Each structure stands twice: as C-alpha cells, then as structure tokens.
Amino acid sequence: LRTMSDGLLTTGVTSFLPTTLTSSYELLLAVTENIGARYKEATGAKIRGLYFEGPYFTEKYKGAQNPAYMKDPSMNEFRAWQKAANGLLNKIALAPERDGVEEFVRTLTDEGVTVALGHSNATFDEAKTAVEAGASVWVHAYNGMRGLTHRELGMVGAMYELPHTYAAVSYTH
C-alpha cells in the first residue's frame, strides 16, 4: 500500500480507492483485512476507501474478471468484508441482472456505499431497476456491457436514458 500510495503521489494523484478484481471470498477478505489495518500508513496519496470491482458480475462481459468466482450478491459477505475493512468499502460494481440485486443495491446505497454497474449483459429494464434502487455509476461504458440495438436498449441505452448517473470510460487500455 505504501508503494502504491507513494507512486501515485509522484504522478499528481492525491487520493485513491484501492480496487479489487473478482476473486474468492477468502482472498477478498484477506485484502480487506490488510487494507483496513494499514490504510493510515499511506505516506503519499491518501486512501479514501476501497472499491470492489466484483465478484457480483456475469460471464458474458467478464473482461479480466475471473468467472469462477462470479455469483449473486450476498449481504453476509459484504458485511464481513466491510467489517474487515474497518468501514472503508465505499464502492462496489455489480451486474444488475444478478438475483437479489435490487435489495442489495438499496441497502448499500442507504448506507452511503456507491454502487456501480458493469461487466453485465443486463437488459434496459434490469439496469433501470438497479438505478432506481440507487446505483449511480456505469463502469467500462460500452466495453463491459450489453450494447444498444433497435430491439433492446440494454445497458448502453440505460446509461444514456437514465438521469442522475455517471458513466466512466477508460481510454488507457
């Protein structure tokens, strides 16, 4: 963490969210324990939270995410990770078509956690349901999501149509 923190500061970054990939529950727990115990030791860019990119994705638009660990959202898992992280887990990305997403998103956003949508084959309606529950960010716009067609607006159509959301596009890959 210190190496990342110091390196980021040399590029002008003053704060960041360490980010995970889809992994096993146990590995993610170890990561949250490590960051939760050491985040104050950052001597460069400050750690302002923790971002989980996964594991609640679907395989079709998996990108670099490991499908072996993709699953439906679990409040029990999230609570364990949040406890291990000392409350730092403040952003998570998921696929809106997973079972239980609406309640999961509503609970997390009510608690101040930012929910992002990506790595998903969701329909427009599935994405809309997640946004109405509180999701507010689109991850990997166009790349990690179902595209727009004349018969199904998909995630891309939802990204354009639904208000009060933010789309992130990476041009560095």
Task: Give residue spans per PLM region.
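Short amphipathic alpha-helices and their capping/turn segments at secondary-structure boundaries
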Residues: 31-44, 128-132
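Conserved small/polar residues in nucleotide/adenosyl-binding loops
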Residues: 172-173
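His/Asp/Glu-enriched, well-ordered alpha-helical/loop segment
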Residues: 154, 158-167
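Short, structured coil/loop segments at alpha-helix boundaries
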Residues: 41-44, 101, 162
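Generic structural signal for well-ordered alpha-helices
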Residues: 5, 32-36, 78, 105
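Divalent metal-dependent hydrolysis catalytic cores, especially in the metallo-beta-lactamase
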Residues: 2-31, 45-58, 85-97, 113-115, ...
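N-terminal cationic-hydrophobic initiation segments that often serve targeting/anchoring roles
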Residues: 36-40, 82, 159-160
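Divalent metal-binding pocket/active-site signature
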Residues: 59-155
